[in-house]
């Protein structure tokens, strides 16, 4: 429709330009008409490629914008995932610390119980060893005294005196 109107105006302009009342010395009118026709044809021929180039540029810009927005969205999702992961790791760290504290307390109690059992066993062993040594010493002292008495023939003691001597030595 626009082309049709354009050609009508061009032909109307040409028909008025062909009027005999105009001075024929000037060719400015014909040059203007030729320029308008040339410009119209040039516009008609170049309009499509320029429009296509412009649309292609718009499409490239919009595709880049979409790619950037997609990357931005992915970055935000990664950021949120990282935040969530960080919170999970923090929670696990707190749980691990609590578990480590409980294990340390349990290990400490276990070591203390083991040490107390070892101490009790050592005390019992010491008491038994002490008891054994006391009995051994009593026997050796008694044997020594008796050997002295029996080896000395000059000493004549009664049985009661011997028992008293042994008791004094032992105690």
Swiss-Prot record:
Keywords: ATP synthesis, Cell inner membrane, Cell membrane, CF(0), Hydrogen ion transport, Ion transport, Membrane, Transmembrane, Transmembrane helix, Transport. Coiled coil: none annotated. The keyword Thylakoid does not apply. It comes from the Bacteria. One of its GO terms (molecular function) is proton-transporting ATP synthase activity, rotational mechanism. GO terms for cellular component: plasma membrane; proton-transporting ATP synthase complex. It is a single-pass membrane protein. It is found in: Cell inner membrane. The chain crosses the membrane at residues 3-23. Belongs to the ATPase B chain family. F(1)F(0) ATP synthase produces ATP from ADP in the presence of a proton or sodium gradient. F-type ATPases consist of two structural domains, F(1) containing the extramembraneous catalytic core and F(0) containing the membrane proton channel, linked together by a central stalk and a peripheral stalk. During catalysis, ATP synthesis in the catalytic domain of F(1) is coupled via a rotary mechanism of the central stalk subunits to proton translocation. This is ATP synthase subunit b.
């Amino acid at each position: 429709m626009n082309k049709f109107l354009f050609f009508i105006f061009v032909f109307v302009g040409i028909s008025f330009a062909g009027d005999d009342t105009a001075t024929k010395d000037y060719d400015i009118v014909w040059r203007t008409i030729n320029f308008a026709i040339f410009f119209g044809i040039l516009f008609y021929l170049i309009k499509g490629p320029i429009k296509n180039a412009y649309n292609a540029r718009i499409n490239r810009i919009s595709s880049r914008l979409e790619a950037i927005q997609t990357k931005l969205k992915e970055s935000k999702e990664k950021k949120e995932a990282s935040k969530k992961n960080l919170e999970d790791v923090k929670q696990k760290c707190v749980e691990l610390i609590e578990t480590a504290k409980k294990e340390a307390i349990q290990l400490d109690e276990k070591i203390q119980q083991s040490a107390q059992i070892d101490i009790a066993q050592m005390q019992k062993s010491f008491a038994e060893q002490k008891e054994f040594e006391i009995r051994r010493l009593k026997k050796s002292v008694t044997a020594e005294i008796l050997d002295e008495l029996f080896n000395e023939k000059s000493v004549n003691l009664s049985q009661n005196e011997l028992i008293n001597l042994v008791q004094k030595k032992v105690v």
